[in-house]
């Protein structure tokens, strides 16, 4: 590459810290909004941002993520790669946003709620601005400028939370939330243009159609695979919105939405691995890639498994505390959603994007699972209602992740001897179950305690027992102990673990 690359740990810690700050800021939004709006307004709000979120996930078609493939490999064409991404996102954003603004009935067709039509213009403008500015974090990370990326993540989430909450508290209307979204998108777009001018001087001065064609050829199958993945992630929500009331959709979306911390560590790690594995693959270092991937699976499992078990034993208390008692009926969907958490550690994207020859295999698998999801969801909805839709989604996501992870290990020539790198996963599961049983004992001992108290005490008890059990079992490595000690020594003046010299 011709440039020194920061270590994986260094980059991941920076991005993880930023995402943790961003995550805790995002908790403020649902806690506040569910106390300002009634269930119907919450349903409309979540339908609006479902449409916006789907558009911002699907429309880039992998163009933004192509930066992770090209920027680590290129020295002379970096500006050409960046301007292609800028042009593509601006064009598709204008086309989609303009179509929704000019033909608002599109919204009522998508979610079967004519109430959204009155917001069409603002929804279209939000899609354009969020789509365009959404490349900011990825471009900085692909450029291995993790400090800037971390700063953008924190600033974007803080400003988003402050702006949306201010508009919600002052105006107390759905349209005010869209005003806030447009303002936020404008701020981030200006930040993007400033960063691109600083990191890629003169990027706007030259366009090469042959490079654009090459980049399009690379991203086309991955973009379609990404479309299939996003469709799979969001389609079940659209099916529920189509067949049930806005109030029912609000309940469903709370339980089936993003779980606490589900993307925080994974996204930080994947963002770093995308660029690093692309570079390693170019040099033919398959063994190093295999070790990196399996160690990443192990680290993610150490977090996702306990969070899943904790949600099973404290899910009701979590819903009441965060979303109030009016959303406690979201619990069955939250339980099904939690089943996917352990599988979230089985990351595949960094390898499947670096090994371009397998792009079409990924596309075929995701399209096949999308078809299965449609068949299962529409078949079960008449017998099991919303539970049937959610169960269909969980089944299809599970099957897809297992298939793609198996493909990833085959690409990397993994053997049975390599699985020793993830043998600690069983220790994490055992420790989480032990901690979960202790929390159940706490709930039995305090049957009349307030849910908020049970959540706080239960989470603290679970964390302590889990960490002690994992440490005693030997599932924490010395380098991980040192990293934890550095963090706790810096902020708490405390060394948690004893590490051998």
What annotation goes with each model-predicted range?
Residues 2, 416, 440-501:
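Membrane-proximal transmembrane or re-entrant/amphipathic helices at the cytosolic face
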């Amino acid at each position: 590459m011709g440039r020194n690359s920061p270590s994986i740990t260094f980059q991941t810690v920076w991005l993880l810290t930023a995402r943790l700050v961003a995550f805790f800021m995002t908790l403020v939004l649902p806690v506040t909004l569910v106390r300002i709006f009634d269930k119907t307004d919450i349903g409309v709000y979540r339908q609006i941002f479902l449409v916006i979120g789907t558009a911002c996930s699907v429309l880039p078609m992998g163009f933004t993520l192509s930066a992770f493939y090209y920027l680590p490999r290129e020295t002379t064409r970096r500006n050409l790669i960046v301007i292609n991404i800028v042009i593509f996102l601006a064009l598709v954003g204008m086309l989609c946003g303009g179509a929704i603004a000019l033909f608002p009935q599109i919204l009522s067709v998508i979610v079967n709620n004519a109430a959204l039509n009155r917001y069409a213009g603002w929804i279209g403008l939000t899609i354009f601005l969020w789509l365009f500015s959404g490349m900011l974090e990825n471009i900085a990370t692909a450029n291995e400028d993790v400090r800037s990326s971390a700063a953008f993540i924190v600033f974007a989430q803080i400003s988003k939370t402050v702006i949306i909450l201010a508009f919600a508290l002052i105006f107390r209307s759905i349209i005010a939330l869209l005003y806030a979204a447009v303002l936020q998108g404008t701020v981030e777009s200006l930040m993007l243009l400033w960063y691109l001018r600083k990191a890629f001087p003169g990027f706007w001065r030259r366009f090469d159609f042959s490079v654009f064609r090459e980049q399009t050829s690379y991203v086309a199958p991955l973009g379609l695979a990404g479309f299939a993945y996003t469709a799979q992630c969001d389609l079940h929500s659209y099916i529920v919105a189509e067949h049930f009331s806005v109030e029912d959709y609000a309940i469903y979306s709370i339980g089936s939405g993003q779980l606490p911390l589900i993307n925080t560590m994974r996204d930080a790690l994947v963002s770093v691995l995308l660029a690093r594995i692309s570079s390693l693959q170019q040099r033919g270092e398959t063994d190093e890639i295999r070790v990196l991937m399996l160690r990443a699976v192990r680290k993610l499992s150490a977090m996702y498994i306990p969070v899943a078990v904790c949600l099973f034993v404290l899910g009701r208390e979590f819903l009441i505390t965060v979303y109030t008692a009016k959303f406690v009926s979201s619990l069955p969907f939250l339980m099904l959603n939690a089943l996917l958490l352990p599988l979230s550690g089985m990351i595949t994207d960094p390898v499947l994007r670096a090994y371009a020859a397998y792009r079409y295999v990924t596309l075929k698998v995701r399209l096949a699972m999308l078809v299965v999801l449609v068949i299962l969801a529409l078949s079960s909805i008449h017998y099991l209602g919303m539970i049937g839709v959610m169960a269909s989604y969980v089944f299809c996501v599970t099957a897809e992740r297992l298939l793609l992870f198996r493909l990833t290990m085959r690409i990397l020539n993994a053997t049975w001897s390599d699985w020793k790198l993830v043998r600690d996963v069983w220790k994490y599961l055992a420790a989480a179950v032990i901690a979960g049983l202790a929390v159940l004992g706490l709930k039995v001992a305090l049957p009349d305690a307030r849910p908020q108290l049970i959540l706080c005490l239960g989470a603290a008890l679970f964390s302590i027992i889990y960490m002690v059990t994992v440490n005693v079992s030997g599932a924490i490595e010395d380098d991980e102990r040192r990293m934890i000690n550095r963090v706790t020594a810096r902020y708490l003046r405390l060394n948690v673990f004893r590490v051998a010299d």
